[in-house]
């Protein structure tokens, strides 16, 4: 993609309304634009990142045996009355009426809808287990939306829901998602620490938040430093191995880890002083087991092996892709701009032509772009008639993993320059060696 043809509305000045790094950089890098309080348009660069985050989430959910669906954003109020949550949810929920005066709502979550879908089709224990998920837009009318997409009113959410015959089977479904989330965050280049959490309006008696550490985190967290180096299960992990998965979950919950809401100072004091870590954290995922909280009032039942009807046991599991984009920036940036992990970078390579219009530079850049794209790498080619300093600033701001710098001086010696954005390391090499060099990392 040529930058001269791309829509990248970069801001030269830091927006006054941006309070945290991710909000500031997302606005400056032309990733998003605010349309109303807590509501954002996703522009091309930001949308590429958002889609890549969703791709990673889908891959890990599919690996764990979950099945993707898509439920309506506008939901019937009657379903929420069945579960008892319509009046309890409060002003966060946007309520509306259609032309026939039927009460509807803009779904902040989808436990009721997915339960209705399940009860209409499942009849027997032989229909279990099931894990259904979607990636769709949600709306919660926050009192004070702030921090850009970190705490917005409209947001993209991956929400999943499991259905099992009993508590033991439901716990295995919970463990599957627990492990798949560890893998998801690892693939995204984030170290997420699972912490016991309050179940809030979702309900239930078992819940974990997945927290990444960041100086601008929204809450204070306390944990054992052991979590910083714990191994994450590999892609080959067997999600059908009940004991094996339980062992992984046990190891990842055996050390102290708590948000400020759940923190117990006396228990934390038992952790060796050198291992205690107090920091700021950002929630990037939340999982719940809530048993029959929804299935009982909504009559989502199946016939068991004994021929008796019983309500199914359920869990729900959320990751916010739009929030994850901001959280990744909070965890990975420097003074010059964003530093994207390879897995979700909008493009792999920033190709910088230092002298547009020079026949040798133009020809070399065309050949390099073709070679990189043939090798399966995505390229954003800066072919603008701008001074080199402006091009370097743009490349650092948008944070693509690699910068390939092509200029007359280097080409005279048959060389180009390669810069790794994360480390700042530079090297010169022959253009023909470039694809293999990048692929080697």
Swiss-Prot record:
Reactions accelerated catalytically: tRNA(Pro) + L-proline + ATP = L-prolyl-tRNA(Pro) + AMP + diphosphate
Subcellular location: Cytoplasm
GO cellular component assignments: cytosol
Source organism superkingdom: Bacteria
Keywords: Aminoacyl-tRNA synthetase, ATP-binding, Cytoplasm, Ligase, Nucleotide-binding, Protein biosynthesis
The UniProt record lists the keyword Transport: no
Pfam families: HGTP_anticodon, tRNA-synt_2b
Gene Ontology BP annotations: prolyl-tRNA aminoacylation
Subunit structure: Homodimer.
Role: Catalyzes the attachment of proline to tRNA(Pro) in a two-step reaction: proline is first activated by ATP to form Pro-AMP and then transferred to the acceptor end of tRNA(Pro).
Family the UniProt entry places it in: Belongs to the class-II aminoacyl-tRNA synthetase family. ProS type 2 subfamily.
Name of the protein described by the UniProt record: Proline--tRNA ligase
Species lineage: Bacteria, Pseudomonadati, Pseudomonadota, Alphaproteobacteria, Hyphomicrobiales
Gene name of the record: proS
């Amino acid at each position: 993609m040529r930058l001269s043809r791309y829509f990248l509305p970069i801001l030269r000045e830091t927006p006054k309304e941006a309070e945290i790094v991710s909000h500031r950089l997302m606005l400056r890098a032309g990733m998003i634009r605010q349309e109303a309080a807590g509501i954002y348009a996703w522009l091309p660069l930001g949308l590429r990142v958002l889609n890549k985050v969703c791709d990673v989430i889908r891959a890990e959910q599919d690996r764990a045996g979950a099945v993707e669906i898509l439920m309506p954003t506008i939901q019937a109020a009657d379903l929420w009355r069945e579960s008892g949550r319509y009046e309890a949810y409060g002003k966060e929920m946007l309520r509306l009426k259609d032309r026939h005066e039927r009460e509807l709502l803009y779904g902040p979550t989808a436990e009721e809808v997915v339960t209705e879908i399940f009860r209409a089709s499942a009849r027997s224990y032989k229909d279990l287990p099931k894990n259904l998920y979607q990636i769709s837009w949600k709306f919660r009318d926050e009192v004070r939306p702030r921090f850009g997409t970190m705490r917005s009113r409209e947001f993209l959410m991956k929400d999943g829901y499991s259905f099992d015959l009993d508590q033991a089977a439901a716990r295995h479904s919970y463990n599957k998602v627990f492990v798949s989330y560890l893998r998801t965050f690892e693939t995204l280049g984030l170290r997420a620490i699972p912490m016991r959490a309050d179940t809030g309006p979702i309900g239930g008696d078992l819940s974990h938040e997945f927290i990444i550490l960041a100086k601008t985190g929204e809450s204070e967290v306390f944990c054992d430093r052991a979590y910083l180096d714990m191994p994450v299960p590999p892609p080959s992990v067997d999600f059908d191995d009940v004991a094996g998965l339980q062992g992984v979950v046990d190891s990842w919950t055996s050390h102290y880890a708590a948000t400020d809401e759940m923190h117990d100072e006396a228990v934390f004091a038992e952790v060796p002083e050198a291992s205690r870590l107090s920091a700021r954290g950002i929630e990037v995922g939340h999982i719940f087991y809530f048993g029959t909280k929804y299935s009982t009032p909504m009559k989502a039942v199946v016939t068991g092996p004994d021929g008796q009807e019983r309500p199914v046991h359920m869990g729900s599991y959320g990751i916010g892709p739009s929030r994850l984009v901001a959280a990744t920036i909070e965890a990975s940036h420097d003074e010059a701009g964003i530093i994207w992990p390879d897995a979700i970078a909008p493009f792999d390579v920033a190709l910088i032509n230092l002298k547009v219009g020079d026949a040798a530079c133009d020809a070399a850049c065309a050949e390099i772009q073709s070679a990189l794209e043939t090798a399966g790498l995505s390229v954003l080619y800066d072919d603008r008639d701008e001074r080199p300093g402006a091009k370097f600033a743009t490349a650092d701001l948008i944070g693509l993993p690699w910068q390939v710098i092509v200029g007359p001086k280097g080409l005279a010696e048959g060389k180009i320059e390669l810069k790794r954005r994360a480390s700042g390391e530079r090297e010169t090499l022959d253009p023909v060696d470039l694809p293999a060099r990048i692929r080697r990392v």
